[in-house]
Amino acid sequence: MTERFQSRLADVIRRPLITEKATRALELNQYTFEVDHRAAKPDIKAAIEQLFDVKVTGISTMNPPRRSRRMGRFAGKRAQVKKAVVRLAEGNSIQLFPES
């Protein structure tokens, strides 16, 4: 685990990504999260295991390119994001949608 996130693992995970593809992956016990773009795989694994009390068996990460945005005549870039697909051990799950 890198020193950057050692004391604050909750800052690694930004939010779960709920898309059509990510929802299909839930059946395979794979969860998709948006994470800090500086986070390494050991940071992500430690954060998921500590926050959700589950066993992680694998992580795939991707850094999609930044997209350009325009506001009138001003051009800019969106913030850098990193996606992580986390595979959990059999029998483990994360409750993304609270039951009422």
UniProtKB/Swiss-Prot annotation:
Q: Which PROSITE patterns match?
A: RIBOSOMAL_L23 (PS00050)
- InterPro entries, alphabetized: Nucleotide-bd_a/b_plait_sf, Ribosomal_uL23-like, Ribosomal_uL23/eL15/eS24_sf, Ribosomal_uL23_CS
UniProt keyword list: Ribonucleoprotein, Ribosomal protein, RNA-binding, rRNA-binding
**GO process annotations (BP):** translation
- The reply on keyword Ribosomal protein is yes
Its domain of life reads Bacteria
Task: Please give one Pfam family short name.
Answer: Ribosomal_L23
Q: What does this protein do?
A: One of the early assembly proteins it binds 23S rRNA. One of the proteins that surrounds the polypeptide exit tunnel on the outside of the ribosome. Forms the main docking site for trigger factor binding to the ribosome.
- In Swiss-Prot or TrEMBL terms, this protein is called Large ribosomal subunit protein uL23
Source organism: Synechococcus sp. (strain CC9902)
Q: Which gene name belongs to this protein?
A: rplW
